[in-house]
Regions:
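Bacterial N-terminal signal peptides that target proteins for export
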Residues: 1-9
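Bacterial N-terminal signal peptides
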Residues: 8-17
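Sec/Tat signal peptide C-region and signal peptidase I cleavage site
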Residues: 19-23
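N-terminal pre-domain segments of enzymes
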Residues: 25-38
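Solvent-exposed, charged/polar functional surfaces in cytosolic regulatory/catalytic domains
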Residues: 50, 54-57, 61, 139-146, ...
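Short, flexible helix-adjacent loops and helix caps
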Residues: 63-67, 109, 145, 149-152
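Acidic/histidine-rich alpha-helical segments that form the ligand environment
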Residues: 121-154, 164-176
Length: 196
């Protein structure tokens, strides 16, 4: 019996060593077995990272001189009733995503945003909007780290919980990511996520 325990310990330690080497070499980390309980913040943070990478790829792919690009009013049919003045430029959309990130993830509690969210909405240059967006993602990651099994479903506004607000924030990004992709393609740019 002692010998069996030693064998199990040696095999377990060897497996840990292999996992560590794979992690250091950039290999795919081991999959989490089905049924494993994962903290809500960690789970949502992984999803946020996926969309952050896609969005940051898109905003970095658009040249600075195209940040004022918006689709031409000519592409809209009169019967659609589109109010063209409400169509955002690429840069305005990037600033809007940053503002929304600060709003949605501030509802999780923890640190309040240390930026003027209204001022973020007025940014126009690529450099400024990308910097604001990068900051908003860093803030979102910090806020998600405060989400635990104990507080994940605490209400924050009416019937909205911390988790539903975080999920809404991520869903909001997905919506605008689709628009960013269309704007890139209208300018002959293949989105980085589509190049993989």
């Amino acid at each position: 019996m002692k010998m069996m325990k030693r064998i199990v310990v040696v095999v377990a330690l060897a497996a840990c060593g292999v996992s560590g080497v794979k992690a250091q070499t950039g290999a795919t980390p081991p999959k989490v077995p089905a049924g494993t309980i994962i903290e809500p913040g960690k789970s949502l943070d992984g999803l946020l990272k996926i969309y952050e990478d896609e969005i940051m790829g898109a905003v970095n792919a658009m040249p600075a001189d195209k940040y004022d690009f918006a689709p031409s009013p000519a592409i809209f049919k009169a019967e659609q009733g589109v109010k063209y003045e409400t169509v955002r430029t690429f840069g305005a959309m990037v600033a809007h995503i940053a503002q929304a990130n600060y709003y949605f993830f501030s509802t999780l509690g923890g640190a309040k945003p240390d930026v003027d969210m209204k001022a973020v909405g007025n940014l126009t240059s690529k450099e400024d909007t990308v910097k604001a967006l990068t900051g908003s993602f860093a803030y979102a990651h910090k806020q998600l780290a405060t989400l635990t099994a104990a507080n994940a479903f605490a209400s924050v506004k009416d019937d909205q919980t911390k988790t539903s607000m975080a999920a809404f924030g991520i869903a909001h990004m997905c919506d605008h990511y689709g628009q960013l992709v269309e704007y890139l393609r209208m300018n002959g740019i293949v989105p980085p996520a589509s190049q993989k």
